[in-house]
């Protein structure tokens, strides 16, 4: 009997391991993407326009991938239309919109810390409405990860917080939680690539109305910019940086996150995704020469410990 149980548990354990690997790769790519985007924004391209280009480029890329691989996967049933539109709006477009609005009024670290309340909201939702048993280790991992993020942004330094900025960041946390929960539901009915293709399609529609594409400052992407920091002697055209943001900063990591939800719960995916600010901070220090104190390094270690703790809660 025990041998049969072990045999059945092995595929599940392998699936969870694969799921965590997908999230960690995605979080790493998102973290690197922060520095790439910062260099792209130094060209004068606004953060909202970069987000618009990110969504449109990812939409085109993902649609082409699905059309080549399995055109039938793009079939859209009438009863899916509203669900996918909501996913594209809340799960893709609004996460970026409210995050960018928040960082106009708050330090990036503070905004990111508030946004990563999202996994805590997922855990609360799972416990209160999803009738999902959330293990004590998961709650401990959430507390540990938020503590680590607080250390990384050195929250105790007495920063005066802008009320509207905090409100935007809190909305960003809510829509980030919605993204995880909506994606966890939708992957039961379609593959991760076609799901993200439709998600970015509806996000692109949103940006088309919010910022018409015909007013996009296309001339800016032809400019060449310095890579700054330790790579200041190197220059790349802005379009190459935008291409990175689209492919390795959007298509690949978003698809990996959604694919991981087939194997790992949204709560645990959210915790593992907290690797993003750790990677973002380290890359910015190594590349852009942004300062990194011993306390921030300790905070990064605490977040990594939280991710490992969540992984052990089976």
Name the predicted role of every residue range.
Residues 2-12, 55, 154-155, 238-240, ...:
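C-terminal-most transmembrane helix of multi-pass membrane proteins
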Residues 2-53, 158-185, 206-209:
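Glycine-/small-residue-enriched transmembrane alpha-helix faces in small-molecule transporters
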Residues 52-53, 96, 110-117, 182-205, ...:
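Helix-helix packing/entry segments at the starts of transmembrane helices
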Residues 2, 21, 42-94, 121-125, ...:
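Transmembrane alpha-helices of multi-pass small-molecule transport proteins
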Residues 29, 34, 63-111, 115, ...:
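Specific transmembrane alpha-helical segments of multi-pass solute transporters/efflux pumps
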Residues 62, 125, 134-155, 173, ...:
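Hydrophobic transmembrane alpha-helices of multi-pass small-molecule transport proteins
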Residues 14-19, 44-52, 76-82, 154-175, ...:
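Juxtamembrane helix-entry segments on the extracytoplasmic side of multipass membrane proteins
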Residues 40, 50, 54, 102, ...:
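Hydrophobic/aromatic residues within transmembrane alpha-helices
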